[in-house]
Design a protein with these regions (language model features):
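Transmembrane alpha-helices
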Residues: 74, 104, 149-168, 182-211, ...
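Membrane-embedded alpha-helices of multi-pass transport/permease systems
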Residues: 32-40, 78-85, 112-115, 128, ...
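Transmembrane-helix boundary motif in ABC transporter permease subunits
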Residues: 51, 71-102, 115, 185-190, ...
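Membrane-interfacial helix termini and adjacent extracytoplasmic/periplasmic loops
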Residues: 3-9, 48-49, 56-59, 94-97, ...
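Cytoplasmic-entry segments and transmembrane alpha-helices of multi-pass inner-membrane transporters
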Residues: 17, 86-117, 172, 186, ...
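Interhelical loop and adjacent transmembrane-helix boundary motif
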Residues: 9-16, 49, 53-56, 139, ...
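C-terminal transmembrane helix and the adjacent membrane-cytosol boundary/short C-terminal tail
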Residues: 2-8, 14-20, 34, 94-95, ...
C-alpha cells in the first residue's frame, strides 16, 4: 500500500511543481532578463570604457547622489518619527487630520509636489517673492530634499508608527516608577526601542532618494544625480553603454542598502514583542515632550496642506500667482488631449494589479507553506522589484525587450518595448507595473499566511482536497483582504509611476504621468495641476472602494480565522 501512496503524493506535487516553475519563469521575465541584459552591457568593453572616460564627472555625480540620499533619509525619518510619536502618544487638535495629511503624498505623482514647490518658493514664488520679496533659487539640493522628504516621509511614518503601537506599556511605567522624567524616558527608552524602525526607514528613504528620476528632472537644476545622468545619456546622446554603466553604479548601493534594511526589518520584533499583554499606551502630557513634538507636527500639517491646495487651486485659475481668474480651461485641455492617456493608464493598471496580486499570493504561499527552508531566496527575489531603482529597472526593460527575445536560436518572445512593439509598448509597461507591485502584496500575503493556523489547510487536505484546491478554496478566502490590499496598492502606485517607465513609454501608449511631466517641461503648470488633481481624485476613489471592500471581507472572514 505504500507504493500507491507514494505515487499519489508525487501526483499531488505535480501542480505545485508547475506553479513553482511558472512563478520562477515569470520572475525571470520580470527581473532576471532585464537585469542580466543591463549588467551585460554595463560590464562590456564599451560600458566600462564609457565609465572610465567620464570618471571624474561620475564621481561628482555619485557624491551628489549619496548626499541627496543621506539628506532625504535623515529629514524624512525625522518627519516620520515626530508624526508617528504624535499619533501614538499625544492628544491634540487635528490628530486625525495629521494621519490623512501625512498619507496624502502616497497618492500623488512624485513630481507633482515639485511643481507646487516651484510655484510657492521659486524666484517668482507666491510665498518667497509675493510675500517676502525674495528671489529664491529653489532648484538644486535644497529643493530636492524638501520635495523628496515630503514624498517619502509617509513610508517612515507608517513603519515607525507600526512599531510604536506594539510597545509594552510596562516599560514606560517602570521608567516612571524609577523617577525618570518624561523627556528622559523619550531619550532613553522610546528612541532606543524605535531605532530599528528608524534605521529601516532611513535605508528605504535613502534608496528612494537616490533612485528618483522625475524630481531631479524638474527641480534638479545644475545638481546632477546618477538617475538623471542615466536619462540624459539615453535621451540626450543615445549612449546606451554609458547609461548601462552608470546604472550599475546606482544599482550596487541600492541593493546593498536593501539587504541591510531587510536584515534590520527581520530583527525589529526582538525589541517590541515581549509575549506579555501589552495594554494601551499611556498618553504623554508633559510639556517638555509635547511642545517640541507638536511644533514640527503642526508645521508639517500646514506645509502639506499649502502644497496640495496649490495643486488644487492652480488647476482652476489661469496662472496661479499671476492671473488668478477662475477658469476651467485646464480641465478642457486635459479632456480634449489627455483623455486617452487617462483611459490607457487606468486600463493598464487594472490589468497589471490583479496579476501582481496573484503572483504575490503564490510567492507568499511557496515561501511560507511549501518551501520554508529555501523560501528566503524566493522572497528576496520577489522583493527585487522594489529594491532595484526604477530608473535601472526601466532601462533594463528597454534594453531587454526592444528586440525579440531568443533562446537556443529560437524566438520565444516578440518585441515588447518601444513604438514598434506588440501593443505599442503597452505590454512592457504592464510588466513593469507588475514587477513594482509584487513586493508589497507579497509581504502582505506572507504576514497574512503566518497568522493562519496551518491546521486549517491540513484539515482540507485530510478530507481529500489537493494542494491547489486547498490554496484556491481555503487559503485564498482567508487572505483575500491582503489580496485586495495588494491590488489597491498596485493600482495606485502604477497610476502615479513615472521613473520606472520613462524609457519605455511610446506615442502609441500615452501614460498620465508622462503627460504631466511633458506639461511641466513646457511650463504649462496649470495643465499639469489639472492632470494631478484628476489623478489624485481617481486614486482616492479607488482607495475608498478598496477600504469598504476590505472592511467587508474582514468582517466575513474573522470568524473563520478564529
Amino acid at each position: 500500500m505504500s507504493i500507491p501512496q507514494l505515487r499519489k503524493g508525487r501526483q499531488l506535487d505535480i501542480p505545485v511543481a508547475l506553479i513553482t516553475t511558472v512563478t520562477v519563469i515569470g520572475l525571470i521575465l520580470l527581473l532576471g532578463i532585464p537585469v542580466a541584459k543591463l549588467i551585460g552591457i554595463g560590464v562590456s568593453e564599451r560600458g566600462l570604457a564609457a565609465i572610465t572616460q567620464s570618471f571624474g564627472a561620475n564621481v561628482d555625480t555619485l557624491v551628489n547622489t549619496l548626499v541627496l540620499g543621506l539628506c532625504v533619509g535623515i529629514v524624512g525619518t525625522f518627519i516620520g518619527f515626530v508624526t508617528a510619536f504624535a499619533q501614538v502618544f499625544l492628544t491634540f487638535p487635528g490628530k486625525k487630520l495629521l494621519h490623512w495629511v501625512t498619507l496624502l503624498p502616497t497618492i500623488s505623482p512624485p513630481f507633482a509636489t515639485a511643481t507646487a514647490i516651484i510655484t510657492l518658493f521659486g524666484k517668482r514664488g507666491i510665498i518667497t517673492y509675493g510675500i517676502f520679496g525674495i528671489e529664491n533659487n529653489i532648484y538644486g539640493l535644497v529643493g530636492l530634499v524638501i520635495v523628496l522628504s515630503l514624498t517619502f516621509a509617509p513610508v517612515a511614518y507608517l513603519n515607525i508608527r507600526g512599531m510604536m503601537e506594539n510597545f509594552d506599556n510596562s516599560l514606560f511605567e517602570a521608567s516612571a516608577t524609577l523617577g525618570a522624567q518624561p523627556l528622559s524616558t523619550l531619550v532613553k527608552v522610546t528612541i532606543p526601542m524605535v531605532v530599528p524602525a528608524m534605521l529601516a526607514s532611513f535605508l528605504v528613504l535613502f534608496v528612494e532618494g537616490i533612485a528618483d528620476l522625475a524630481n531631479p528632472l524638474v527641480l534638479g537644476g545644475d545638481f546632477r544625480v546618477l538617475a538623471s545622468q542615466i536619462y540624459f545619456a539615453v535621451a540626450g546622446s543615445g549612449d546606451i553603454a554609458s547609461a548601462a554603466g552608470i546604472a550599475l553604479v546606482l544599482l550596487l548601493p541600492a541593493l546593498t542598502v536593501f539587504a541591510v534594511q531587510k536584515y534590520w526589518s527581520n530583527r525589529k520584533s526582538v525589541i517590541t514583542v515581549t509575549g506579555k499583554p501589552v495594554g494601551s499606551l499611556k498618553e504623554v502630557t508633559a510639556s517638555s515632550v509635547k511642545i517640541p513634538m507638536l511644533v514640527p507636527v503642526y508645521g508639517w500639517i500646514v506645509f502639506v496642506i499649502v502644497v496640495y491646495m496649490t495643486l488644487f487651486v492652480g488647476s482652476f485659475v489661469k496662472i496661479l500667482g499671476v492671473d488668478n481668474t477662475f477658469t476651467m480651461e485646464h480641465f478642457w485641455y486635459v479632456q480634449r488631449l489627455g483623455s486617452s492617456a487617462i483611459l490607457t493608464t487606468l486600463s493598464m493598471t487594472l490589468v497589471a494589479a490583479p496579476i501582481a496580486a496573484v503572483m504575490a499570493l503564490i510567492i507568499a504561499w511557496l515561501v511560507v507553506r511549501k518551501f520554508p527552508k529555501i523560501g528566503k531566496i524566493l522572497d528576496f527575489w520577489g522583493m527585487l522589484g522594489i529594491a532595484i531603482p526604477g530608473t535601472v529597472l526601466g532601462l533594463g526593460f528597454a534594453l531587454a525587450y526592444s528586440n525579440p527575445t531568443w533562446l537556443f536560436g529560437k524566438q520565444i518572445l516578440p518585441t515588447l518595448a518601444g513604438g514598434l512593439a506588440v501593443g505599442g509598448g503597452a505590454i512592457a509597461i504592464i510588466l513593469v507595473y507588475i514587477a513594482r507591485a509584487i513586493p508589497t502584496g507579497q509581504q502582505a500575503c506572507i504576514s497574512a499566511l503566518k497568522q493562519i493556523n496551518p491546521q486549517v489547510e491540513e484539515a482540507a487536505r485530510s478530507l481529500g482536497a489537493s494542494q491547489v484546491s486547498t490554496l484556491v478554496k481555503v487559503t485564498l478566502p482567508l487572505v483575500r483582504s491582503g489580496i485586495v490590499t495588494a491590488v489597491t496598492y498596485g493600482i495606485t502606485k502604477s497610476m502615479t509611476m513615472i521613473t520606472a517607465i520613462i524609457f519605455i513609454t511610446t506615442p502609441q501608449t500615452k501614460v498620465m504621468t508622462s503627460q504631466i511631466l511633458d506639461e511641466v517641461d513646457a511650463g504649462r503648470f496649470g495643465h499639469a495641476f489639472a492632470y494631478c488633481t484628476l489623478l489624485i481624485g481617481l486614486v482616492l476613489i479607488i482607495l475608498m472602494i478598496a477600504n469598504l471592500l476590505v472592511n467587508r471581507l474582514n468582517r466575513s472572514t474573522r470568524t473563520v480565522v478564529k
